[in-house]
């Protein structure tokens, strides 16, 4: 499938003009705060960097006072953010323009449909495809919610820039508005003073649904159906995009996730979508003024009108309005029910009648006036037992369908399009909650809980000491033969066990009241054996979520390390062979999900080893499923950076092994990229469209690489990857000075103290690299600009292969030209190297206290230079990013500013370690961390 890359069409002239305007406004705001001399100092730093005089730049920064640092840190943090906004606006403009003139671009859904429609099984593909972005709260989203809101204001103003240029909008007013928001941004705290709580993370992510995701997903789903009809393909209920969420349910290493946060995550979702429905229904109420004197209505709609709490004489002859009033009153009752949160009492809504003006969780403000106006009517109707709440979203959908059918039957079909059709589509996609919530916990916690249960029930005293075979035998017996619940004994339970059981009980409650889809899977971190999966089954059995025939929550193994990925084939062979598992899967539509960990496998073995091991594991696991008639679906735990599986989403999906995407794919969207991808409705639509198009493309496009050649390619990769893994581990785990280098020559200590998420930086006290979470590990290498997880070990391994035999370079060049996986792998390394900077990294190395520790940098530098030479040789390129001119131009805009910020950060770290910063001034380091992450556009 051939597409023009959208990013190559960006209007650099417009972006350059906008950046000039934004820089001028930021200069003015800085001048007002720091004075002319303060702004001159900042401009001098940029001049020194442009001249390449890094020693003079370092000296100038060292002479700055801490007060000078305040304004410089803010300036160099905010300018890259403003550049980002301009680029995002231009991207949205290009998407809309190309859609309107029917021009192709990468990931355009209509062109993907052209290819899919030619397949013999086009209908099955389109009916069943399901892409699930899963929003996580990993601690890499460093911007405050307030800053995100200011960003959106500036985004909306820049969207009007072309109209300003065309004279359609008053230039002076537009400029004044833009100036005001830049001024506010310059005077707003960039970072959080306190660490986020899980509750804050939940409410923050809800804002993305309010501002963009509900609209974008609804629009995309509607477009998907429209294109199918256009191709003459009749679909029943396609769900090309549904959302997932970890926030509130992911307790792996986060002690602050509890049964209450799980419940809050579910109920807040319901309140957000219900508020959306109530507003939409109110719009329909206002517009559907059809008179019964002039049009007919169905009996069903007439009955709804009779039940309406709107008894005004002025609406006696307006049955549709009264029907919508009836629907809205039921929605309000449903909202009140969820706000009460007491799912065991169906009259919970009525108890809120004394406090009618309720807070709207989606906005933090009161329920809108139109809701308030009808709340009292609705509650009065409840007291008269004439209006109930909707027990299911299906019941709400049925009422809307009744109105739709009435319109169709009475020649009023033209009224269905617009708001009504949009509402109907939203209900079909979301129901009464926005996203499926995943639960996740580490396998060691499950084992400890099961061991405690078995001991308290006098079954096994020393479960953890049993062999794997013995463990599986004990667990299977309990699952298949023992109907009792082990936790029913009177023996006191540990706090950990109590918390785990409470979460599982809440999960069952939510599924019982909100539906099966609200919580569908539980992920087991560090899955290393079959017993790890059966241990979770035992805990789910305790609350009635698992029995001998059915698992209401699917057990999803997460294979993370290189060793676990290599063993995943044998583990799943054994697991899928048990009769009880076969029955569970049969009752789950023959799907078994497996999660793949990109972050930890990279930290464990390096970029090449991680990428290749993941590739092979997918092939092997898919084959196991096919042998057993099971659809293996993969959940890709990818981060924002290449070091954590990131990179361009379209290329990442289309380079997956052919056949490994059956129809469903899930992938994490990590903290720092959520704002970039889904911060506004245009960006959200484009990124979701790309995910769906890429998935469809990979499902229908056969392997373009010659099968015989592919065998040779795999043998070459096996050899190179083994070498790369050894080189990487020799440095990271074998060099005696590496640990000290990482902790002294990067801002890892400062990153760990940054208030960017609710979760600790490590599961326990860090004594070695293996104890550190993958996210702060990658985040810190991004900050010191080495980007080590995205490339180290690549250059030497390829170079050894090239030098081993004449013609090997040509083989690698051929692989790059003909094998999508290999091309994507190397293109990501190219991108990472383009964002790295060894001059800056050298100055970070000087933060290390001893010469022995500083010498680690020389090893890294040699490998960086070798990797650069080898990658460019294989690509046949002269420089980085030759195939991504827009990204190259983008870096050209921003590098001078956030590179200076690195030098400022280095000086601040020096002062901090010499105890020359006050507590307030320490926050400046956090501001620089924020600015560098913003400039890179992906950080952890």
Curated annotation (Swiss-Prot):
Domain of life, per lineage: Bacteria
EC main group: lyase
Gene3D superfamilies named in the record: Phosphoenolpyruvate/pyruvate domain
Catalytic activity: oxaloacetate + phosphate = phosphoenolpyruvate + hydrogencarbonate
Cofactor: Mg(2+)
Active-site residues (renumbered): 138, 603
Protein source organism: Streptococcus thermophilus (strain CNRZ 1066)
Similarity comment: family membership: Belongs to the PEPCase type 1 family.
Record GO biological process: carbon fixation; oxaloacetate metabolic process; tricarboxylic acid cycle
Entry annotated with the keyword Lyase: yes
Transmembrane segments: none
Gene Ontology molecular function, alphabetical: magnesium ion binding; phosphoenolpyruvate carboxylase activity
Free-text function comment from the UniProt entry: Forms oxaloacetate, a four-carbon dicarboxylic acid source for the tricarboxylic acid cycle.
Entry-linked InterPro entries: PEP_COase (IPR021135), PEP_COase_bac/pln-type (IPR022805), PEP_COase_Lys_AS (IPR018129), PEPCASE_His_AS (IPR033129), Pyrv/PenolPyrv_kinase-like_dom (IPR015813)
The enzyme's E.C. designation: 4.1.1.31
Protein name listed in UniProt: Phosphoenolpyruvate carboxylase
Signal peptide boundaries: none
Record key words, sorted: Carbon dioxide fixation, Lyase, Magnesium
SUPFAM superfamilies referenced in this protein's UniProt entry, alphabetically: Phosphoenolpyruvate/pyruvate domain
A GO cellular-component term linked to this record: cytosol
Pfam families membership: PEPcase
Gene that this polypeptide is encoded by: ppc
């Amino acid at each position: 499938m051939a597409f023009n890359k959208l990013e190559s069409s960006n209007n650099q002239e417009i972006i350059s003009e906008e950046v000039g305007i934004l820089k001028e406004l930021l200069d003015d705001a800085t001048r007002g705060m720091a004075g002319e001399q303060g702004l001159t100092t900042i401009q001098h730093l940029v001049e020194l960097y442009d001249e390449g005089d890094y020693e003079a730049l370092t000296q100038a920064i060292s002479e700055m006072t801490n007060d000078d640092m305040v304004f410089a840190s803010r300036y160099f943090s905010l300018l890259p953010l403003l550049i980002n906004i301009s680029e995002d606006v231009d991207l949205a403009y290009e998407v809309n323009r190309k859609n309107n003139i029917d021009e192709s671009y990468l990931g355009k859904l209509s062109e993907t449909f052209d290819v899919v429609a030619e397949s013999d099984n086009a209908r099955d593909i389109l009916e069943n495809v399901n892409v699930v972005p899963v929003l996580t709260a990993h601690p890499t989203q460093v911007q405050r919610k307030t800053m995100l809101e200011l960003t959106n204001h500036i985004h909306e103003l820049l969207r009007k820039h072309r109209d300003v240029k065309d004279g359609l909008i008053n230039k002076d007013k537009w400029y004044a508005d833009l100036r005001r928001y830049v001024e506010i941004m310059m005077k707003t705290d960039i970072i959080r003073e306190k660490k986020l709580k899980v509750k804050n993370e939940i409410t923050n992510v809800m804002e993305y649904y309010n501002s963009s995701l509900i609209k974008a997903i609804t629009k995309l789903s509607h477009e998907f159906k429209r294109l199918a009809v256009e191709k003459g393909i009749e679909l029943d209920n396609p769900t090309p995009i549904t959302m997932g969420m970890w926030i509130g349910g992911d307790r792996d290493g986060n002690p602050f996730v509890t049964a209450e946060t799980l419940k809050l995550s579910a109920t807040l979702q319901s309140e957000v979508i219900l508020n959306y429905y109530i507003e939409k229904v109110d719009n329909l109420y206002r517009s559907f003024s059809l008179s019964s004197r002039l049009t007919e209505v169905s009996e069903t709609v007439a009955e709804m009108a009779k039940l309406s709490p709107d008894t005004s004489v002025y609406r006696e002859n307006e049955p549709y309005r009264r029907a919508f009033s009836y629907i809205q009153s039921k929605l309000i009752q449903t909202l009140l029910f969820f706000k009460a949160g007491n799912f065991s009492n169906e009259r919970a809504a009525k108890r809120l009648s004394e406090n009618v003006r309720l807070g709207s969780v989606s906005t933090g403000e009161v329920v809108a006036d139109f809701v308030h106006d009808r709340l009292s009517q609705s509650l009065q109707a409840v007291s008269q037992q004439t209006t109930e709440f909707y027990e299911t979203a299906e019941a709400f959908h049925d009422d809307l369908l009744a109105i739709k059918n009435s319109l169709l039957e009475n020649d009023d079909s033209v009224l269905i399009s617009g708001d009504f059709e949009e509402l109907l589509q939203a209900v079909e996609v979301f129901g009464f909650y926005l996203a499926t919530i995943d639960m996740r916990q580490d396998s060691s916690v499950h084992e400890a809980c099961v061991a405690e249960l078995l001991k308290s029930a006098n079954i096994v005293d020393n479960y953890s000491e049993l062999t794997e075979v013995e463990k599986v035998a004990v667990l299977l017996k309990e699952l298949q033969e023992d109907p009792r619940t082990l936790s029913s004994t009177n023996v006191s339970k540990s706090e950990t066990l109590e918390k785990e059981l409470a979460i599982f009980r809440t999960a069952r409650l939510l599924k019982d009241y909100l539906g099966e889809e609200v919580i569908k899977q539980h992920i087991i971190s560090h899955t290393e054996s079959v017993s790890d999966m059966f241990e979770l089954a035992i805990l789910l059995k305790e609350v009635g979520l698992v029995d001998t025939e059915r698992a209401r929550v699917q057990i999803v193994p997460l294979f993370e390390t290189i060793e676990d990925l290599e063993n995943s084939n044998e583990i799943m062979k054994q697991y899928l062979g048990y009769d009880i598992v076969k029955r569970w899967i049969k009752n789950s539509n023959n799907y078994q999900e497996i999660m793949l960990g990109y972050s930890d496998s990279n930290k464990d073995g390096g970029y090449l080893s991680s990428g290749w091991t993941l590739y092979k594991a997918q092939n092997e696991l898919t084959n196991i499923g096919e042998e057993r008639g099971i659809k293996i679906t993969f959940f890709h735990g990818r981060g924002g950076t290449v070091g954590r599986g990131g990179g361009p989403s379209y290329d990442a999906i289309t380079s997956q092994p052919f056949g490994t995407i059956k129809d469903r794919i899930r992938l994490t969207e990590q903290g720092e990229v959520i704002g970039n991808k889904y911060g506004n409705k245009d960006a959200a639509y484009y990124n979701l469209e790309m995910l769906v198009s890429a998935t469809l493309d990979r499902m229908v496009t056969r392997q373009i690489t010659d099968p015989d050649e592919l065998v040779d390619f795999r043998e070459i990769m096996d050899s190179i990857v083994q070498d790369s893994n050894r080189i990487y581990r020799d440095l990271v785990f074998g060099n005696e000075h590496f640990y000290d280098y990482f902790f002294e020559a990067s801002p890892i200590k400062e990153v760990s103290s940054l208030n960017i998420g609710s979760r600790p930086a490590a599961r326990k006290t860090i004594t070695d690299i293996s104890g550190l979470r993958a996210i702060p590990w990658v985040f810190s290498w991004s900050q010191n600009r080495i980007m080590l997880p995205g490339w180290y070990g690549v250059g030497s391994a390829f170079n050894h292969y090239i030098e081993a035999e004449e013609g090997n370079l040509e083989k690698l060049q051929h692989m790059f030209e003909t094998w999508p996986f290999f091309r994507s792998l190397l293109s990501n390394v190219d991108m990472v190297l383009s964002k790295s900077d060894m001059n800056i990294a050298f100055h970070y190395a000087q933060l290390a206290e001893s010469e022995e520790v500083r010498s680690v940098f020389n090893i890294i530098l040699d490998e960086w230079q070798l990797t650069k030479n080898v990658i460019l040789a294989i690509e046949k390129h002269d420089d980085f990013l030759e195939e991504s001119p827009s990204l190259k131009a983008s870096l050209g805009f921003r590098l001078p500013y956030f590179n200076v910020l690195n030098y400022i950060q280095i000086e601040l770290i020096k002062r901090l370690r010499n105890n020359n910063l006050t507590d307030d001034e320490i926050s400046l380091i956090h501001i620089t961390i924020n600015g560098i992450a913003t400039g890179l556009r992906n950080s952890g």
